[in-house]
Amino acid sequence: MKNVRFVALALAAAAPFSNGVAAAPRQHVVVIDKMRFGPLPNGIHVGDTILWVNRDLFQHSATARDGSFDADLPAGKSGRTVMRRAGAIAFACKYHPGMTGVIKVAR
């Protein structure tokens, strides 16, 4: 009987999380400093926003190689991009091609 109660409680506790409704979009931050993209966040999903913060003294960009986003980032400024598709999205700074990264976006 204890096992039945435990299973019933576990199912009841999980019910609010299994309603099929997608989580609300989140904002993730990537800092650009010293000619590098900072650590890339985990847990990015379609619909989430990335806030790119340029702390460098130079203009940079966050430009997807597939054209899905392109944020120009003057020195000391920031910009946002919304992730519209799932997958591994390679990106680079169009002004400094050695600055690269890959964002992993889940559905």
List the predicted regions and their residue ranges.
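Extracytoplasmic copper-binding redox domains, predominantly the cupredoxin/blue-copper superfamily
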Residues: 2, 8, 16-107
